[in-house]
Amino acid sequence: PPAAKAIIVLGSGVINGQPSPTLANRLDRAAPVVLAQPNAKLVLTGGVDFAETESEAAVMSRYLQQRYNIPTAQIILEDQSTSTELNLQNSQALLSAQQISTQQPIVIITSDFHTLRAAAIAKKQGYNQVSMLGATTPLGTRYNAWLREYFAYGSGWLLNEYWLGNSPNQAQRSLAM
Protein backbone atom coordinates (compact mmCIF):
# COMPACT_ATOMS: atom_id res chain seq x y z
CA PRO A 1 0.00 0.00 0.00
CA PRO A 2 1.05 3.62 -0.47
CA ALA A 3 2.37 5.69 2.42
CA ALA A 4 -0.58 6.30 4.72
CA LYS A 5 -1.39 8.95 7.27
CA ALA A 6 -3.49 6.40 9.14
CA ILE A 7 -4.22 2.69 9.22
CA ILE A 8 -7.63 1.57 10.47
CA VAL A 9 -8.22 -2.04 11.53
CA LEU A 10 -11.89 -2.99 11.76
CA GLY A 11 -12.88 -5.20 14.70
CA SER A 12 -14.34 -8.68 14.33
CA GLY A 13 -15.08 -10.16 17.71
CA VAL A 14 -13.34 -11.17 20.90
CA ILE A 15 -13.52 -14.55 22.61
CA ASN A 16 -12.60 -14.73 26.31
CA GLY A 17 -10.44 -11.62 26.12
CA GLN A 18 -8.59 -12.77 22.98
CA PRO A 19 -9.07 -11.83 19.32
CA SER A 20 -11.36 -14.22 17.43
CA PRO A 21 -9.55 -16.18 14.68
CA THR A 22 -10.95 -13.74 12.09
CA LEU A 23 -9.77 -10.73 14.10
CA ALA A 24 -6.34 -12.29 14.72
CA ASN A 25 -5.95 -12.67 10.94
CA ARG A 26 -6.80 -8.99 10.47
CA LEU A 27 -4.25 -7.99 13.09
CA ASP A 28 -1.59 -10.27 11.62
CA ARG A 29 -2.28 -8.70 8.21
CA ALA A 30 -2.01 -5.21 9.72
CA ALA A 31 1.23 -5.69 11.68
CA PRO A 32 3.73 -5.58 8.77
CA VAL A 33 1.92 -2.58 7.26
CA VAL A 34 2.05 -0.73 10.58
CA LEU A 35 5.69 -1.64 11.21
CA ALA A 36 6.62 -0.41 7.72
CA GLN A 37 4.90 2.95 8.38
CA PRO A 38 5.92 4.11 11.87
CA ASN A 39 4.63 7.65 11.25
CA ALA A 40 1.10 6.48 10.45
CA LYS A 41 -1.45 6.49 13.24
CA LEU A 42 -3.08 3.12 13.90
CA VAL A 43 -6.80 3.18 14.75
CA LEU A 44 -8.11 -0.03 16.31
CA THR A 45 -11.90 -0.20 16.25
CA GLY A 46 -14.51 -2.00 18.29
CA GLY A 47 -16.52 -1.48 21.44
CA VAL A 48 -17.48 -3.83 24.25
CA ASP A 49 -19.30 -6.99 23.15
CA PHE A 50 -22.28 -8.10 25.26
CA ALA A 51 -20.33 -11.11 26.58
CA GLU A 52 -17.07 -9.25 27.26
CA THR A 53 -15.79 -6.71 29.77
CA GLU A 54 -13.02 -5.20 27.63
CA SER A 55 -13.40 -3.42 24.30
CA GLU A 56 -12.31 -5.07 21.07
CA ALA A 57 -9.99 -2.11 20.49
CA ALA A 58 -8.19 -2.74 23.82
CA VAL A 59 -7.82 -6.47 23.07
CA MET A 60 -6.48 -5.63 19.61
CA SER A 61 -3.97 -3.18 21.07
CA ARG A 62 -2.68 -5.70 23.60
CA TYR A 63 -2.32 -8.37 20.88
CA LEU A 64 -0.33 -6.07 18.58
CA GLN A 65 1.89 -4.79 21.39
CA GLN A 66 2.66 -8.24 22.78
CA ARG A 67 3.09 -10.05 19.47
CA TYR A 68 4.62 -7.32 17.27
CA ASN A 69 5.89 -4.63 19.67
CA ILE A 70 3.73 -1.95 18.06
CA PRO A 71 4.41 1.24 20.08
CA THR A 72 1.50 2.56 22.15
CA ALA A 73 2.23 6.08 20.88
CA GLN A 74 1.17 4.97 17.40
CA ILE A 75 -2.15 3.45 18.58
CA ILE A 76 -5.53 5.17 18.88
CA LEU A 77 -8.41 3.19 20.40
CA GLU A 78 -11.88 3.64 18.92
CA ASP A 79 -13.69 1.68 21.61
CA GLN A 80 -17.32 2.77 21.25
CA SER A 81 -18.51 1.27 17.96
CA THR A 82 -20.61 -1.79 17.28
CA SER A 83 -20.76 -1.77 13.45
CA THR A 84 -18.62 -1.07 10.40
CA GLU A 85 -20.47 2.19 9.82
CA LEU A 86 -19.76 3.36 13.39
CA ASN A 87 -16.14 2.07 13.25
CA LEU A 88 -15.43 4.42 10.36
CA GLN A 89 -17.60 7.30 11.57
CA ASN A 90 -16.02 7.35 15.04
CA SER A 91 -12.53 6.98 13.56
CA GLN A 92 -12.99 10.24 11.64
CA ALA A 93 -13.24 12.30 14.83
CA LEU A 94 -10.24 10.56 16.38
CA LEU A 95 -8.16 11.13 13.24
CA SER A 96 -9.30 14.75 13.01
CA ALA A 97 -7.95 15.31 16.54
CA GLN A 98 -4.58 14.16 15.13
CA GLN A 99 -4.90 16.59 12.17
CA ILE A 100 -5.61 13.71 9.77
CA SER A 101 -8.53 14.10 7.37
CA THR A 102 -10.43 11.62 5.23
CA GLN A 103 -8.90 13.40 2.21
CA GLN A 104 -5.48 11.98 3.09
CA PRO A 105 -4.22 8.43 2.33
CA ILE A 106 -5.75 5.92 4.74
CA VAL A 107 -5.41 2.13 4.75
CA ILE A 108 -8.40 0.13 6.01
CA ILE A 109 -7.73 -3.46 7.00
CA THR A 110 -10.56 -5.94 7.32
CA SER A 111 -11.34 -9.46 6.13
CA ASP A 112 -11.31 -10.40 2.45
CA PHE A 113 -15.08 -10.99 2.48
CA HIS A 114 -15.71 -7.56 4.04
CA THR A 115 -13.61 -5.24 1.84
CA LEU A 116 -16.31 -4.40 -0.72
CA ARG A 117 -18.91 -3.30 1.84
CA ALA A 118 -16.37 -1.52 4.05
CA ALA A 119 -15.03 0.40 1.02
CA ALA A 120 -18.57 1.45 0.04
CA ILE A 121 -19.29 2.70 3.56
CA ALA A 122 -15.95 4.53 3.72
CA LYS A 123 -16.62 6.23 0.39
CA LYS A 124 -20.04 7.42 1.52
CA GLN A 125 -18.50 8.83 4.71
CA GLY A 126 -15.99 10.86 2.70
CA TYR A 127 -12.87 8.72 2.87
CA ASN A 128 -11.40 9.68 -0.51
CA GLN A 129 -7.94 8.09 -0.59
CA VAL A 130 -8.57 4.63 0.82
CA SER A 131 -6.52 1.51 0.21
CA MET A 132 -8.35 -1.64 1.29
CA LEU A 133 -6.39 -4.65 2.52
CA GLY A 134 -8.17 -7.94 3.11
CA ALA A 135 -7.01 -10.59 5.56
CA THR A 136 -7.70 -14.23 4.77
CA THR A 137 -10.82 -15.60 6.45
CA PRO A 138 -10.25 -18.80 8.49
CA LEU A 139 -11.52 -21.81 6.54
CA GLY A 140 -13.90 -22.88 9.31
CA THR A 141 -15.86 -19.62 9.09
CA ARG A 142 -15.31 -18.68 5.44
CA TYR A 143 -18.62 -19.86 3.94
CA ASN A 144 -20.79 -18.47 6.74
CA ALA A 145 -18.89 -15.17 6.58
CA TRP A 146 -19.37 -14.80 2.83
CA LEU A 147 -23.07 -15.66 3.10
CA ARG A 148 -23.60 -13.24 5.99
CA GLU A 149 -21.76 -10.51 4.08
CA TYR A 150 -23.92 -11.08 1.00
CA PHE A 151 -27.03 -10.29 3.04
CA ALA A 152 -25.33 -7.45 4.93
CA TYR A 153 -24.37 -5.81 1.64
CA GLY A 154 -27.98 -5.96 0.43
CA SER A 155 -29.25 -4.63 3.73
CA GLY A 156 -26.74 -1.77 3.64
CA TRP A 157 -27.89 -0.85 0.15
CA LEU A 158 -31.50 -0.71 1.33
CA LEU A 159 -30.52 1.38 4.35
CA ASN A 160 -28.57 3.79 2.11
CA GLU A 161 -25.22 3.12 3.81
CA TYR A 162 -23.35 3.43 0.51
CA TRP A 163 -22.67 6.20 -1.93
CA LEU A 164 -23.87 4.86 -5.27
CA GLY A 165 -22.99 7.54 -7.79
CA ASN A 166 -21.80 11.06 -8.37
CA SER A 167 -23.86 12.74 -5.68
CA PRO A 168 -25.02 11.60 -2.24
CA ASN A 169 -28.66 12.22 -3.22
CA GLN A 170 -28.47 9.91 -6.24
CA ALA A 171 -28.60 6.86 -3.96
CA GLN A 172 -31.74 8.19 -2.29
CA ARG A 173 -33.35 8.89 -5.67
CA SER A 174 -32.61 5.37 -6.91
CA LEU A 175 -34.19 3.89 -3.78
CA ALA A 176 -37.34 5.99 -4.24
CA MET A 177 -38.00 4.60 -7.74
Language model regions located:
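A structural signal for short, hydrophobic/glycine-enriched beta-strand patches
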Residues: P1-L147
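A general structural signal for short secondary-structure boundary/capping elements
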Residues: F50-E56, A152-L159, L175-A176
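A transmembrane-helix-recognition feature enriched in membrane-embedded lipid enzymes
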Residues: R142-N166
